[in-house]
């Protein structure tokens, strides 16, 4: 499943083909005892150069397709690498336990933290169970319960965002999807404890915002963050979903653009090839960033943190007319 999905991305085909050639040469060298060391070294050097060139020139839409891949690490892939000890907690205490939004308590370095995050599936069956990472009202209420627990016991909060958006089915609307997200926004501004939000893959619309209010917003290098998917934006503005490439460019969904615009605070580097190419290295880089930001935030008084958090989000949306260089 994962390989077939990767092959559907044209920009990855040269990399996958070269990786296949390296695998075949390695097998020949191993099983036929043929010395191919120089050839293998040469191919691996070519692969490193090719990966660098491809991933340095990704378009916004290519980044979106990349983070939608099944092998992209999810919240529950990162947690065992980041936390030395952790325990998943369940339920919103209202009869729901949404598997699309997970959370728990864990140990990050010397900090006891509460974490919540969207959870996508790894295959068709898992994606159906996880609703493709689209959380229901019960999921956001579960997240709120855990974050209130963190605030009560003075535990920092870490959120991990990776969703195409909140679930928009009739049942979700009946159960108060908009209200659940709105309450989370209000409450997250009021919490005294440090909050760090990290966009792991796809940060989509209100589904992302439901756990996206924090003192620091981190974003993985190839992740995207958008008010609407490029496909939806193209359909709304131009009545043509095929113009998703134009929409992706206009929406400024990449980490570099959002850093310039002040929507996020820090871009977290990924291994060449994306976090899916080396999950453990990607997790290590993210862990170091989280520890550094937590160390800074814990030095501030709660009132100072809340004021800075409020001011940060009040500034988002400021724009400058007639400044083409600013918007790229």
UniProtKB/Swiss-Prot annotation:
Subunit structure: Acetyl-CoA carboxylase is a heterohexamer composed of biotin carboxyl carrier protein (accB), biotin carboxylase (accC) and two subunits each of ACCase subunit alpha (accA) and ACCase subunit beta (accD).
Summary of the function given for this chain in its UniProt record: Component of the acetyl coenzyme A carboxylase (ACC) complex. First, biotin carboxylase catalyzes the carboxylation of biotin on its carrier protein (BCCP) and then the CO(2) group is transferred by the carboxyltransferase to acetyl-CoA to form malonyl-CoA.
Main localization (coarse): plastid
Subcellular locations according to the entry: Plastid, Chloroplast
HAMAP family linked to this entry: AcetylCoA_CT_alpha (MF_00823)
SUPFAM superfamilies in UniProt: ClpP/crotonase
EC number(s) on file: 2.1.3.15
Protein's name according to its UniProt entry: Acetyl-coenzyme A carboxylase carboxyl transferase subunit alpha
GO CC aspect terms: acetyl-CoA carboxylase complex; chloroplast
Residues in CoA carboxyltransferase C-terminal domain copies: 42-296
Swiss-Prot/TrEMBL catalytic activity: N(6)-carboxybiotinyl-L-lysyl-[protein] + acetyl-CoA = N(6)-biotinyl-L-lysyl-[protein] + malonyl-CoA
Main enzyme class: transferase
Single GO MF descriptor: carboxyl- or carbamoyltransferase activity
Family: Belongs to the AccA family.
Record keywords: ATP-binding, Chloroplast, Fatty acid biosynthesis, Fatty acid metabolism, Lipid biosynthesis, Lipid metabolism, Nucleotide-binding, Plastid, Transferase
This protein's pathway: Lipid metabolism; malonyl-CoA biosynthesis; malonyl-CoA from acetyl-CoA: step 1/1
InterPro entries found in the cross-reference section: Acetyl_CoA_COase_a_su, ClpP/crotonase-like_dom_sf, COA_CT_C
Pfam families in the record: ACCA
GO biological process, one term: fatty acid biosynthetic process
